[in-house]
Amino acid sequence: MLFWLLALLFLCAFLWNYKGQLKIADIADKYVFITGCDTGFGNLAARTFDKKGFRVIAACLTESGSAALKAKTSERLHTVLLDVTDPENVKKTAQWVKSHVGEKGLWGLINNAGVLGVLAPTDWLTVDDYREPIEVNLFGLINVTLNMLPLVKKARGRVINVSSIGGRLAFGGGGYTPSKYAVEGFNDSLRRDMKAFGVHVSCIEPGLFKTELADPIKTTEKKLAIWKHLSPDIKQQYGEGYIEKSLHRLKSNTSSVNLDLSLVVGCMDHALTSLFPKTRYIAGKDAKTFWIPLSHMPAVLQDFLLLKQKVELANPKAV
């Protein structure tokens, strides 16, 4: 009995692996639109998919980012300047993409653009500190999707939303984790709505990677700017050495970040080219071995482990 059970499990694993290796054909006539291509995951994705033969349309925020990307890619790749928080800019870009791709439609939409915003204790913040990451990571992603969706439906293509382990666990105050939690919800509802149209929707959840978004120095500079304007009561509660201690803790945590950005781009590649793309992709050793498993644990265990990473307050009773 045990033998047959093991044989069945082996067969299921083999078939699952085989199914995941089946690829689409005719990449050369398929268009892919990627946001956030100035640096990081988006930049590497644009270069990678251009080399594979896709017709890439790379959305950059800056002229310099666009020029640098063009210099490293083929004539197939086109760049557009796009601020995902500007509705008129998004609308005009979608109109241009529609005229560019014609009847072929858009095989892939990769929503990659994102910002970290301010990462600081919640009682340091104002509602304005939450706006930027929510505007970019959530409303920008939704607006781009809604404008490009008719083209994706025409091609019966793919939508790939880059979320984060911050969409599974809230590891700090600010707008980043609320925005990513919301992206997860939008992704799931979109996936179910698009099922009948033959459109596959996938979500990528990267761990901590060495990108501009995760720069510990920039994160600390933003935190320090807020600290200077805090009330004396808040400063007394946290202590004058809090910023330095949190920077030291942040640097020690980021010393083990993932350096290989291709781990995320590889997930994008599978979601674009597999006949049977996954609904979710987990990228990075830390995400697979710590963050995602922890997200399934009871809240009391999550709190215990995450609070161990926090800097101890000088005088929390001084309220």
UniProtKB/Swiss-Prot annotation:
It is found in: Microsome membrane; Endoplasmic reticulum membrane. One of its GO terms (cellular component) is endoplasmic reticulum membrane. Its EC number is 1.1.1.209, 1.1.1.53, 1.1.1.105. The active site is at Y176. Keywords: Endoplasmic reticulum, Lipid metabolism, Membrane, Microsome, NAD, NADP, Oxidoreductase, Signal, Steroid metabolism. It catalyses: 3beta-hydroxy-5alpha-pregnane-20-one + NAD(+) = 5alpha-pregnane-3,20-dione + NADH + H(+); 17beta-hydroxy-5alpha-androstan-3-one + NAD(+) = 5alpha-androstan-3,17-dione + NADH + H(+); androsterone + NAD(+) = 5alpha-androstan-3,17-dione + NADH + H(+); 5alpha-androstane-3alpha,17beta-diol + NAD(+) = 17beta-hydroxy-5alpha-androstan-3-one + NADH + H(+). Residues 1-20 form the signal peptide. It is an enzyme of class 1 (oxidoreductase). It comes from the Eukaryota. NAD(+) binds at residues 34-58, 83, 180. GO terms for biological process: 9-cis-retinoic acid biosynthetic process; androgen metabolic process; progesterone metabolic process. One of its GO terms (molecular function) is androsterone dehydrogenase [NAD(P)+] activity. Its main location: membrane. Substrate binds at S164. 3-alpha-hydroxysteroid dehydrogenase that converts 3-alpha-tetrahydroprogesterone (allopregnanolone) to dihydroxyprogesterone and 3-alpha-androstanediol to dihydroxyprogesterone. Also plays a role in the biosynthesis of retinoic acid. Can utilize both NADH and NADPH. Homotetramer. PANTHER family: DEHYDROGENASE_REDUCTASE SDR FAMILY MEMBER 9, SHORT-CHAIN DEHYDROGENASE/REDUCTASE FAMILY 9C. Belongs to the short-chain dehydrogenases/reductases (SDR) family. This is Dehydrogenase/reductase SDR family member 9. It comes from Mus musculus (Mouse). The gene is Dhrs9.
